[in-house]
Design a protein with these regions (language model features):
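A conserved regulatory-domain signal marking ACT and ACT-like small-molecule sensing domains
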Residues: 6-204
Length: 204
């Protein structure tokens, strides 16, 4: 019997850790080229796997490191097959699924401030509601058509009908309206968060 002091946040943490313990979720640090299209290619190569966490922050280097959580079938064979597929596609990655520090802390530390931008560029940040179904992220990136430079991305599966993502774009100041027109065409609800105090304090 669960005591009344166990709140929903604690329950969510227990479920998340138990999925890793049962080998249903894997956590990877995976490197991709820092260029337009790489983000979408990774999502396409992941396929119809259920993404539980997806965290990325542009830092000005030639390679981007993605913190990726995936829910797989409850078998070692499923995991081995997936990782072999990544190797065959020439991805460089580290399996952090059994690393306690990563499970406890890294997922909440990954990111930080972005690179210094030239004066004509700004970073615009939006919270976006993604349908909780396989392929939703790939659909979002496909509809954007590699037109926009994504500089920040964090998605967390909350087990609800919609999952929240925080997405940042590096654009010229005059492109804000054009970007928002493209976001409207995708039909995922979004809210501009560029002036958010938390973003300003820790991520800008």
């Amino acid at each position: 019997y669960c005591g009344s002091n166990l709140n929903f946040e604690s329950l969510g943490h227990i479920v998340e850790r138990s999925k890793i313990g049962e080998k249903k979720e894997i956590i990877l640090s995976i490197a991709i080229d820092e260029k337009k299209g790489s983000f979408r290619k990774l999502c396409r190569d992941i396929g119809q796997k259920n993404i539980t966490e997806f965290s990325y922050r542009k830092d000005g280097s030639s390679n981007a490191k993605i913190l990726l959580g995936l829910e797989l079938q409850d078998s070692k064979k499923s995991k081995d097959t997936f990782l072999k597929g990544l190797k065959n596609k020439k991805y460089s990655f580290i399996d952090l699924s059994n690393d306690e520090i990563s499970k406890k802390h890294l997922k909440f530390m990954h990111g930080g401030r972005g690179p210094q931008l030239e004066s004509e560029f700004v970073e615009e940040v939006y919270s976006v509601d993604f349908p909780e179904k396989p392929g939703a992220l790939l659909n979002f990136l496909t509809l954007l058509k590699d037109k926009w430079d994504i500089s920040l991305f964090h998605y967390k599966n909350q087990g609800a009908i919609y999952g929240g993502a925080l997405v940042g774009f590096t654009i010229r100041q005059k492109q804000v309206k054009s970007l928002e027109r493209d976001l409207l065409r995708i039909s995922y609800p979004f809210t501009r968060e560029t002036e958010n105090l938390g973003y300003q304090a820790f991520l800008k």
